Every structure is written in C-alpha cells, then in structure tokens.
C-alpha cells in the first residue's frame, strides 16, 4: 500500500518540479502536465477512499440500511446503469434476469450496488481485448438469488484464484500492470456480500475471462412455528 501511495506522489512531485523549472514551456505541454497531476491525484483519492471504507467495514462501522425490495426491479436498474456506462466505453453488455416479479430480497441497495460496480470495475481494469464484453445474469437457485458477472478479459491464473478476495492480495498481472489496484476492492465486495448473509466466488480461464458469482437469500415470510430460513444451507462455490 505504501508503494501504491508513493507512486502517484512521486509522479505529482516530478511534474510540479517540471512546471517550476520551466520544462512545460508550451501550452500543450503545460496542459499535459496539469492533466497528469490531476489524474494522479484522483488515483490517490480513490485509494484513500478504498482504505477508509475497508477500515470501516472491517471494524463494523458501516451502518447498513436494509430494505425489502423487488429483485427483478433492483437488479434491472443496476443493469440499465451498467449498460449506459459500458456503452460509453465501447464495451458490449449483455443482461439477463429470470427472476419472478414477486421475488423480493432484503438488501442495502447502496452497498450491494457497490459490490456490482467494484466487480465490473475490476473487469474493465484488466480488459485486454478491443471487443470487450461484460455479462450480467440474475437467476433463481431455490432459496437464493445468484448473480453472475462475467467478462472476456485476460483471466486469472489458477494459482491466484483462491486468494483474489483476500485483503491486499494482488495477482502477478495486477502487480505488473500500470492499472494494478490496491488489492482492496474485491475484499470489500466479499465483506458486503457476507454482511448480506451471502457468499461469493469466481471461476476464470487465462486468456478467456473471469466470472464472479454471488448469492443472497430471498426474502421469505416465516411464521413462528415454521422452520427459520436462517438454517438453510448457503451455496458455496457451486455453479447452478
């Protein structure tokens, strides 16, 4: 993490010194230097925000605002937002939601959207093909809802796959990439999914792409005499 913070700081100092020394001696060069400083400052801001958020989540200082909502409607809205964002980046997006209209979930809409956004951002970060593709599928798996987010990026090595949700873990591709992240984004995702009583895992093939899966329980009205749905077995690393 100290390296990730120091890298943009070093770049900012270098470009500021260049401006002070008169190296940026044309309007074009000055514009390029200022834009680079701005971008590097944004990188630092994002990293600090991720660190702050993870610290709050890790110490249970994030207040969750759970509400009962339509699974089809909520994930449909998420899909529409992704479609607009990815279309602007030239990424093909495919969405499928086979949930019944009356199926409901108890979620924190803001935090669960963060899960989806973090996963897709991670996909875009390592998209190495000109015809990039992202897919989102929401389906019924009994007492649970399963969300699948896939891409056709560079994929993850088999040796790295078991650890991608670990805090600060970065794959070789991430460490060697100029776009490599802090290793916090997916650990935040895991924490939020688990706070929703769910589970998350991934499959991947190098050169072909990665698919992230997470499951959350459906909302179920149970009487006092009924068996509590909290005793249901949570799907773990099983594809349906």
Where in this protein do the model-derived segments appear?
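Short helix-loop "hinge" at the ATP-lid/N-box region of the Bergerat-fold HATPase_c
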Residues: 123-124
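Short conserved segment of the HATPase_c
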Residues: 156-170
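Short alpha-helical segment of the dimerization/phosphotransfer core of two-component systems
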Residues: 39-44
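A conserved beta-strand-to-alpha-helix junction within the catalytic ATP-binding
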Residues: 65-83
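Conserved micro-motifs of the catalytic ATP-binding
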Residues: 59-64, 104-107
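Conserved glycine-rich
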Residues: 197-198
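Conserved small/polar residues in nucleotide/adenosyl-binding loops
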Residues: 230-236
């Amino acid at each position: 993490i100290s390296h990730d913070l120091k890298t943009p700081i070093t770049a900012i100092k270098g470009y500021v010194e260049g401006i002070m020394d008169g190296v940026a001696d044309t309007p074009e060069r000055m514009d390029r230097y200022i834009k680079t400083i701005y971008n590097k400052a944004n990188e630092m801001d994002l990293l600090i925000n991720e660190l702050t958020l993870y610290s709050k989540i890790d110490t249970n200082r994030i207040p969750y605002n759970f509400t009962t909502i339509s699974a089809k409607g909520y994930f449909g809205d998420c899909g529409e937002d992704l479609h607009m964002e990815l279309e602007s980046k030239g990424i093909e997006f495919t969405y499928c939601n086979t949930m019944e209209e009356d199926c409901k979930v108890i979620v924190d809409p803001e935090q669960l959207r963060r899960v989806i956004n973090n996963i897709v951002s991670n996909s875009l970060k390592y998209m190495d093909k000109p015809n990039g593709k992202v897919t989102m599928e929401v389906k019924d798996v009994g007492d649970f809802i399963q969300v699948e987010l896939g891409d056709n990026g560079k994929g993850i090595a088999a040796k790295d796959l078991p650890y991608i949700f670990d805090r600060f873990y970065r794959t070789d591709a991430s460490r060697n990439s100029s776009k490599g992240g802090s290793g916090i984004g997916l650990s935040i995702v895991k924490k939020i999914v688990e706070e929703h009583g769910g589970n998350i895992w991934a499959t991947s093939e190098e050169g072909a792409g990665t698919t992230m899966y997470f499951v959350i329980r459906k909302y179920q009205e149970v009487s006092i005499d009924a068996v509590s749905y909290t005793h249901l077995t949570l799907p773990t690393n099983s594809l349906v």
